[in-house]
Regions:
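Short alpha-helix boundary/capping motifs
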Residues: 54, 111-112, 137-139, 306-307, ...
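Enzymes that bind and transform nitrogen-containing heteroaromatic metabolites
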Residues: 1-19, 75, 143-145, 150-358
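Zn2+-dependent cytidine deaminase-like catalytic core
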Residues: 26-125, 212, 238, 242-243, ...
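Active-site beta-strand termini and strand-to-loop segments that position acidic
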Residues: 28, 138-139, 355-357
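N-terminal subdomain of lithium-sensitive/metallo-dependent phosphomonoesterases centered on the IMPase/IPPase/PAP
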Residues: 1-44
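Short capping loops/turns at secondary-structure boundaries
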Residues: 99, 103, 119-122, 137-141, ...
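Proteins enriched for Cys/Gly/acidic motifs involved in redox and nucleic-acid/cofactor modification
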Residues: 14-18, 43, 107, 121-149
């Protein structure tokens, strides 16, 4: 049953920030009585959602939850209290919640009410699902996931800037699915200037799950006529800059964009400072989509935690544009390293998923 709860939690990724994505399945005598997951915007929590949809009494049942039930009064009542009031006899949690507001208190509340508590089943997968939430708690920043679509020899465009299309329709659709599982998409000013992108999720049924669009632009030069700005009231747009002309800032804010100032470094946005600011705003999972300058900045700052590489079956040569800008490595000992998680075939292309090496 924990696997079912974990699957429910995965369905909520990208939709619950700043809260974690939690799944809950409640069973008795081998029969599922209720299912729930954290809903969009982080409320209701997974346990409360399951209890609200229960067909009948939950007395004597077992609740499988992917994270310790909360015990503090926030915008809603504590989930630990809701489970006690529902009459469950046993709670199986994948993880103890390290949030200082919880941190074992939820389990203690359950035990005090005579409910049996077990912790640890499904812990590895639950940790991965909420890696962004845990990253923000422990380091004050979101998890950053770099997505690259490249040729077999690691290039993303010809010398003249032609890039449509390196990968096929299936891989591009999967990239939109990936967007829907993140709180935000991040690109640099060069990508916006070259492509004038929408940065939305354009898969049928997932359009409303388009994440926050973030643009790093040190001089705040984002055009009010760009597609991003024109759609800022439909899909949130955040401009992260070190400085900006006051008249342009006024136009951007009037269009619905949010302007965020951070410190600079060598004439560019300091990505470490930007990461902390995004964490303060509640983001837990950010998909970094480019371009090469942004990718290298995040890699040099050791901020990339996950990496997805879609590879198309073509060679482009050394005169083409690289997926990653210069890293200035003094030797291989200084190279960012990742551990392979999985390789899959997506249409006629491949997808490699990597995790930052520990």
């Amino acid at each position: 049953m924990m696997r079912a709860a974990l699957a429910l939690a995965r369905r909520s990724l990208g939709r619950t920030w700043p809260n974690p994505a939690v799944g809950c399945v409640i069973v008795r005598d081998g029969h599922v009585l209720a299912r729930g997951r954290t809903q969009d915007g982080g409320r209701p929590h997974g346990e409360a959602d399951a209890i609200a949809h229960a067909a009948g009494s939950l007395k004597g049942a077992t609740a499988y939850v992917t994270l310790e039930p909360c015990s503090h009064q926030g915008r809603s009542s504590p989930c630990a209290d809701a489970l006690v009031e529902a009459g469950v006899a046993r709670v199986v949690s994948a993880l103890q919640d390290p949030d200082p507001k919880v941190d074992g208190r939820g389990h203690a509340r359950l035990k005090a009410a005579g409910i049996a508590v077990e912790v640890g089943e499904g812990a590895v997968e639950a940790t991965e699902i909420n890696a962004g939430f845990l990253m923000r708690l422990r380091h004050g920043r979101p998890l950053f996931h770099l997505k690259i679509a490249a040729s077999l020899d690691g290039h993303t465009a010809t010398a003249g800037g032609h890039s449509k299309w390196i990968t096929g329709p299936a891989a591009r659709a999967d990239g939109h699915r990936l967007r829907a599982t993140h709180d935000a998409i991040l690109v640099g000013a060069n990508t916006v200037a070259a492509d004038d992108p929408d940065l939305t999720c354009r898969l049928p049924g997932l359009e409303r799950y388009s994440p926050v669009r973030i643009v790093l632009d040190s001089k705040g030069g984002l055009s009010p006529d760009s597609r991003l700005v024109r759609s800022a009231r439909e899909v949130p747009l955040w401009l992260v800059c070190t400085e900006i002309d006051s008249s342009r800032e006024y136009l951007l804010r009037e269009a619905g964009a949010d302007v965020i100032r951070v410190v600079g470094r060598q004439g560019r946005v300091d990505v470490t400072a930007a990461a902390q600011e995004l964490g303060k705003r509640g983001l837990t999972r950010v998909l970094v989509e480019g371009g090469a300058t942004v990718a290298s900045a995040f890699l040099k700052a050791e901020l990339i935690d996950r990496l997805s590489v879609y590879r198309g079956g073509l060679m482009m040569g050394a005169d083409s544009r690289s997926a990653v800008g210069p890293l200035g490595l003094a030797g291989l000992d200084f190279a960012p390293r990742f551990s392979l998680v999985s390789t899959s075939i997506v249409g006629g292309d491949t997808l490699e998923t990597w995790r930052k090496a520990s």
